[in-house]
Amino acid sequence: MAYLYIIIGAIFVNNFILAQFLGICPFLGVSKKTDSALGMGIAVIFVMGVASIITYAVNLLLVKWGVEYIQTIAFILVIAALVQLVEIVIKRFSPGLYNALGVYLPLITTNCAVLGVAIVNVTPSYGYNLIQAFLNGIFSGVGFTLAIVLMAGIREKLVHSDIPESFRGFPITLVAASIMSMAFTAFGGMI
């Protein structure tokens, strides 16, 4: 049952974008087309999942050696290495997706949602073991993907909508994001 709480919580209740407001830059930047949003989401799922395992192990070493104060730097280095790996793979096997993601792919390195999940996984108050940390990482990525793909779908529909000129573009995107955020807060009562 604890695993189910982690999964539901990571996707809906504690969604990094819509509940904790982390990862807003790629959320607003890559969510113009569903293809790009899905590609970015899959990359983030991979990075969050693998980073959760590696940073969990790295944190155990940092605690053992008594150097917990370099946790954030160590986690950023792990995330940066994983993002480079993802970038190489996407560039090789899907050049179209690589070009569509553009500058936002390297920005996964500085995506605070990825760092946030790594830090949450090792926070003692959560008490996650390695499996729970991995599940939280993967399903936080799924929540990120859900939010960014939903936003991309909304933005694709908004392009063809009759919107007052002062709301076109970024303003209507923020309005749509705020409504999505309010909808996701309704899941808070589930757990």
Description of each model-found segment:
Residues 1-4, 57-70, 119-134, 188-191:
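Helix-coil boundary and interhelical linker segments in multi-pass alpha-helical membrane proteins
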Residues 3-18, 66-81, 134-147:
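Structural signature of hydrophobic alpha-helical transmembrane segments
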Residues 21-29, 87-93, 104-107, 112-127:
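Generic transmembrane alpha-helix signature in multi-pass membrane proteins
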Residues 21-36, 83-97, 151-162:
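C-terminal ends of transmembrane helices
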Residues 35-46, 70-75, 97-109, 166-172:
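Cytoplasmic-side transmembrane-helix entry/capping segments in multi-pass membrane proteins
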